[in-house]
Design a protein with these regions (language model features):
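Intrinsic disorder/low-complexity signature
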Residues: 1, 20-22, 86, 201
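N-terminal secretory signal peptides that target proteins for export/translocation
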Residues: 1-7
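Generic alpha-helix initiation/capping and coil-helix boundary signal
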Residues: 8-9, 22, 39
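C-terminal segment of classical bacterial N-terminal signal peptides
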Residues: 17-27
Length: 265
Protein backbone atom coordinates (compact mmCIF):
# COMPACT_ATOMS: atom_id res chain seq x y z
CA UNK A 1 0.00 0.00 0.00
CA UNK A 2 1.10 3.56 -0.50
CA UNK A 3 1.92 5.81 2.48
CA UNK A 4 -1.55 7.24 2.87
CA UNK A 5 -3.29 3.90 2.38
CA UNK A 6 -1.07 2.15 4.92
CA UNK A 7 -1.59 4.78 7.58
CA UNK A 8 -5.27 5.19 6.96
CA UNK A 9 -5.77 1.46 6.86
CA UNK A 10 -4.64 1.32 10.48
CA UNK A 11 -7.27 3.82 11.44
CA UNK A 12 -9.96 2.26 9.32
CA UNK A 13 -9.55 -1.06 11.00
CA UNK A 14 -9.98 0.70 14.17
CA UNK A 15 -13.45 1.38 13.22
CA UNK A 16 -13.67 -1.97 11.78
CA UNK A 17 -13.10 -3.80 14.95
CA UNK A 18 -14.88 -1.32 16.97
CA UNK A 19 -17.98 -1.62 15.07
CA UNK A 20 -17.93 -5.32 15.13
CA UNK A 21 -16.85 -5.79 18.66
CA UNK A 22 -16.72 -2.58 20.59
CA UNK A 23 -20.40 -2.20 21.30
CA UNK A 24 -23.29 -4.16 22.64
CA UNK A 25 -25.59 -3.32 19.73
CA UNK A 26 -27.76 -6.18 18.64
CA UNK A 27 -26.35 -6.18 15.11
CA UNK A 28 -22.77 -6.76 16.11
CA UNK A 29 -22.60 -7.72 19.77
CA UNK A 30 -19.96 -10.31 20.67
CA UNK A 31 -19.41 -12.55 23.64
CA UNK A 32 -16.74 -11.65 26.23
CA UNK A 33 -14.59 -14.57 25.06
CA UNK A 34 -12.83 -15.00 21.70
CA UNK A 35 -15.31 -17.55 20.37
CA UNK A 36 -15.11 -17.83 16.56
CA UNK A 37 -18.10 -16.48 14.69
CA UNK A 38 -20.34 -18.85 12.73
CA UNK A 39 -18.94 -17.44 9.49
CA UNK A 40 -16.65 -14.69 8.20
CA UNK A 41 -17.70 -11.16 9.08
CA UNK A 42 -16.77 -8.59 6.46
CA UNK A 43 -16.71 -4.82 6.73
CA UNK A 44 -16.47 -2.02 4.20
CA UNK A 45 -13.93 0.65 5.15
CA UNK A 46 -13.81 4.05 3.47
CA UNK A 47 -10.87 6.32 4.25
CA UNK A 48 -11.38 9.97 3.33
CA UNK A 49 -8.96 12.91 3.41
CA UNK A 50 -10.83 16.21 3.69
CA UNK A 51 -9.53 19.36 2.04
CA UNK A 52 -7.98 21.83 4.51
CA UNK A 53 -10.53 24.45 5.45
CA UNK A 54 -13.48 22.24 4.50
CA UNK A 55 -13.77 20.24 7.71
CA UNK A 56 -16.89 21.96 9.08
CA UNK A 57 -18.68 21.77 5.74
CA UNK A 58 -17.69 18.12 5.36
CA UNK A 59 -19.12 17.24 8.77
CA UNK A 60 -22.34 19.11 8.02
CA UNK A 61 -22.64 17.27 4.69
CA UNK A 62 -22.16 13.95 6.47
CA UNK A 63 -24.73 14.63 9.19
CA UNK A 64 -27.45 16.28 7.12
CA UNK A 65 -27.15 14.68 3.68
CA UNK A 66 -25.06 11.51 3.64
CA UNK A 67 -26.23 9.75 6.80
CA UNK A 68 -29.98 10.32 6.24
CA UNK A 69 -29.61 8.98 2.69
CA UNK A 70 -27.70 5.91 3.88
CA UNK A 71 -30.39 5.13 6.45
CA UNK A 72 -33.14 5.58 3.86
CA UNK A 73 -31.22 3.29 1.51
CA UNK A 74 -31.19 0.51 4.08
CA UNK A 75 -27.76 0.72 5.70
CA UNK A 76 -28.07 -0.57 9.27
CA UNK A 77 -25.16 1.27 10.85
CA UNK A 78 -22.00 3.19 10.16
CA UNK A 79 -19.28 4.39 12.48
CA UNK A 80 -16.87 7.25 11.88
CA UNK A 81 -13.41 7.55 13.45
CA UNK A 82 -10.77 10.25 13.28
CA UNK A 83 -7.09 10.53 14.19
CA UNK A 84 -6.47 12.17 17.56
CA UNK A 85 -4.55 15.35 18.31
CA UNK A 86 -1.84 13.14 19.77
CA UNK A 87 -0.84 11.91 16.32
CA UNK A 88 -2.15 11.37 12.81
CA UNK A 89 -3.78 13.34 10.01
CA UNK A 90 -6.39 15.70 11.47
CA UNK A 91 -8.18 15.84 8.10
CA UNK A 92 -8.62 12.09 7.82
CA UNK A 93 -11.83 10.18 8.58
CA UNK A 94 -12.57 6.46 8.52
CA UNK A 95 -16.09 5.18 7.87
CA UNK A 96 -16.98 1.58 8.66
CA UNK A 97 -20.14 -0.26 7.64
CA UNK A 98 -21.26 -3.90 7.37
CA UNK A 99 -21.05 -6.09 4.28
CA UNK A 100 -23.80 -8.71 4.41
CA UNK A 101 -22.98 -10.32 1.07
CA UNK A 102 -20.61 -9.43 -1.75
CA UNK A 103 -23.62 -9.68 -4.07
CA UNK A 104 -24.67 -6.30 -2.67
CA UNK A 105 -22.07 -4.74 -4.97
CA UNK A 106 -23.88 -6.06 -8.07
CA UNK A 107 -26.54 -3.39 -7.64
CA UNK A 108 -26.96 0.17 -6.43
CA UNK A 109 -25.51 0.95 -3.01
CA UNK A 110 -27.43 2.30 -0.03
CA UNK A 111 -26.49 5.89 -0.85
CA UNK A 112 -27.81 5.69 -4.41
CA UNK A 113 -30.95 3.91 -3.23
CA UNK A 114 -31.57 6.64 -0.68
CA UNK A 115 -30.95 9.57 -3.03
CA UNK A 116 -32.06 8.23 -6.39
CA UNK A 117 -29.93 8.39 -9.54
CA UNK A 118 -30.05 12.17 -9.97
CA UNK A 119 -29.59 12.86 -6.28
CA UNK A 120 -26.64 10.49 -6.16
CA UNK A 121 -24.97 12.28 -9.08
CA UNK A 122 -25.40 15.60 -7.26
CA UNK A 123 -24.03 14.03 -4.07
CA UNK A 124 -20.90 12.85 -5.92
CA UNK A 125 -20.29 16.34 -7.30
CA UNK A 126 -20.62 17.92 -3.87
CA UNK A 127 -18.52 15.26 -2.13
CA UNK A 128 -15.69 15.62 -4.64
CA UNK A 129 -15.45 19.33 -3.79
CA UNK A 130 -14.82 18.54 -0.12
CA UNK A 131 -12.20 15.78 -0.22
CA UNK A 132 -8.76 15.17 -1.69
CA UNK A 133 -8.79 11.37 -1.70
CA UNK A 134 -10.98 8.34 -1.02
CA UNK A 135 -9.77 4.76 -0.54
CA UNK A 136 -11.95 1.73 0.09
CA UNK A 137 -11.13 -1.61 1.68
CA UNK A 138 -12.96 -4.77 2.61
CA UNK A 139 -11.68 -6.48 5.74
CA UNK A 140 -12.48 -9.58 7.71
CA UNK A 141 -12.84 -9.44 11.47
CA UNK A 142 -10.82 -12.15 13.22
CA UNK A 143 -12.90 -13.05 16.24
CA UNK A 144 -10.75 -16.15 16.75
CA UNK A 145 -7.76 -13.90 17.50
CA UNK A 146 -9.67 -11.31 19.54
CA UNK A 147 -10.98 -10.77 23.06
CA UNK A 148 -14.04 -8.61 23.65
CA UNK A 149 -14.75 -7.38 27.16
CA UNK A 150 -18.28 -6.17 27.52
CA UNK A 151 -17.87 -2.39 28.03
CA UNK A 152 -20.09 -0.07 30.01
CA UNK A 153 -20.47 1.99 26.84
CA UNK A 154 -18.85 2.57 23.45
CA UNK A 155 -15.07 2.72 23.44
CA UNK A 156 -13.80 6.25 22.94
CA UNK A 157 -10.14 5.61 22.13
CA UNK A 158 -8.13 2.90 20.42
CA UNK A 159 -4.42 2.16 20.20
CA UNK A 160 -4.14 0.95 16.61
CA UNK A 161 -1.22 -1.26 15.62
CA UNK A 162 -0.69 -2.14 11.96
CA UNK A 163 1.41 -5.28 11.56
CA UNK A 164 2.83 -6.44 8.24
CA UNK A 165 3.66 -10.15 8.28
CA UNK A 166 6.25 -11.84 6.06
CA UNK A 167 4.76 -13.78 3.12
CA UNK A 168 3.76 -17.38 3.89
CA UNK A 169 4.09 -16.89 7.65
CA UNK A 170 0.52 -15.89 8.46
CA UNK A 171 -0.28 -19.11 10.31
CA UNK A 172 2.73 -18.69 12.61
CA UNK A 173 1.72 -15.14 13.42
CA UNK A 174 -1.88 -16.12 14.07
CA UNK A 175 -0.82 -18.97 16.35
CA UNK A 176 1.29 -16.54 18.38
CA UNK A 177 -1.56 -14.06 18.76
CA UNK A 178 -4.08 -16.76 19.65
CA UNK A 179 -1.95 -18.77 22.09
CA UNK A 180 0.47 -16.25 23.62
CA UNK A 181 -0.54 -12.62 23.18
CA UNK A 182 -4.34 -12.49 23.24
CA UNK A 183 -4.64 -14.60 26.44
CA UNK A 184 -2.75 -11.86 28.31
CA UNK A 185 -5.29 -9.31 27.10
CA UNK A 186 -8.04 -11.57 28.36
CA UNK A 187 -6.26 -11.91 31.70
CA UNK A 188 -6.05 -8.11 31.93
CA UNK A 189 -9.70 -7.76 30.80
CA UNK A 190 -8.72 -5.35 28.04
CA UNK A 191 -10.58 -5.50 24.74
CA UNK A 192 -8.19 -6.59 21.99
CA UNK A 193 -9.49 -6.82 18.43
CA UNK A 194 -7.88 -8.11 15.24
CA UNK A 195 -8.78 -7.64 11.60
CA UNK A 196 -7.22 -8.79 8.31
CA UNK A 197 -7.34 -7.12 4.90
CA UNK A 198 -9.18 -8.97 2.15
CA UNK A 199 -9.49 -6.45 -0.71
CA UNK A 200 -7.98 -3.02 -1.27
CA UNK A 201 -4.70 -3.45 0.60
CA UNK A 202 -1.90 -5.73 1.74
CA UNK A 203 -3.25 -9.25 2.35
CA UNK A 204 -0.39 -9.86 4.80
CA UNK A 205 -1.42 -6.94 7.01
CA UNK A 206 -3.23 -7.34 10.31
CA UNK A 207 -4.51 -4.46 12.40
CA UNK A 208 -4.94 -4.85 16.14
CA UNK A 209 -6.91 -2.52 18.37
CA UNK A 210 -6.29 -2.20 22.08
CA UNK A 211 -9.28 -0.34 23.44
CA UNK A 212 -8.87 2.40 26.04
CA UNK A 213 -11.35 4.63 27.81
CA UNK A 214 -9.11 7.71 27.96
CA UNK A 215 -5.61 9.00 27.34
CA UNK A 216 -4.99 8.64 31.08
CA UNK A 217 -5.10 4.87 30.57
CA UNK A 218 -1.96 5.18 28.46
CA UNK A 219 -0.05 6.61 31.43
CA UNK A 220 -0.35 3.22 33.10
CA UNK A 221 1.97 1.70 30.50
CA UNK A 222 1.56 -1.20 28.02
CA UNK A 223 -1.10 -3.75 28.92
CA UNK A 224 1.41 -6.60 28.84
CA UNK A 225 3.57 -4.87 31.43
CA UNK A 226 0.57 -4.04 33.60
CA UNK A 227 -0.55 -7.68 33.56
CA UNK A 228 2.78 -9.50 33.75
CA UNK A 229 5.45 -7.03 34.80
CA UNK A 230 8.49 -6.11 32.69
CA UNK A 231 10.09 -9.55 32.80
CA UNK A 232 6.86 -11.40 32.06
CA UNK A 233 6.02 -9.07 29.19
CA UNK A 234 9.44 -9.62 27.61
CA UNK A 235 8.99 -13.38 27.81
CA UNK A 236 5.72 -13.14 25.88
CA UNK A 237 7.22 -10.86 23.23
CA UNK A 238 10.20 -13.19 22.79
CA UNK A 239 7.87 -16.05 21.87
CA UNK A 240 7.16 -14.40 18.53
CA UNK A 241 9.34 -16.28 16.00
CA UNK A 242 12.05 -14.14 14.40
CA UNK A 243 11.37 -12.72 10.96
CA UNK A 244 7.58 -13.02 11.03
CA UNK A 245 6.88 -9.29 11.44
CA UNK A 246 8.44 -7.05 8.81
CA UNK A 247 6.89 -3.69 9.74
CA UNK A 248 4.85 -2.17 12.59
CA UNK A 249 3.07 1.20 12.87
CA UNK A 250 1.08 2.52 15.81
CA UNK A 251 -1.47 5.34 16.08
CA UNK A 252 -4.39 6.61 18.17
CA UNK A 253 -7.93 7.16 16.97
CA UNK A 254 -11.18 8.39 18.49
CA UNK A 255 -14.84 7.72 17.78
CA UNK A 256 -16.87 10.60 16.31
CA UNK A 257 -20.38 9.76 17.59
CA UNK A 258 -22.05 12.81 16.04
CA UNK A 259 -21.11 11.53 12.56
CA UNK A 260 -22.02 7.90 13.28
CA UNK A 261 -25.34 6.09 13.44
CA UNK A 262 -26.29 2.80 15.05
CA UNK A 263 -29.19 0.36 14.65
CA UNK A 264 -32.35 0.98 16.64
CA UNK A 265 -32.53 -0.92 19.91
Amino acid sequence: MNHISSRTFQVFCIATLLLCGGHAHRSFAQTPTPTPAAGPQFLSITVVSVKPGMNAEFQDFMKNTTNPALKKGGLMWREVWQSTAAGGDAFEYVMVSPVGKFAEYDGAGALEKGLGAQGFAAWQTKASSLVTSVHRFIVRTRNDLSFQRQPAGPHKLAVVTSIHVAPNRNSEFENYIKNDYMPVMKQAQVTYLVTQTIFGGDANEYVTLTMRDSFADLDKGPVLVQALGEEGAQKVLQKLPAGIVVHVERSLSRLVPELSFMPAQ
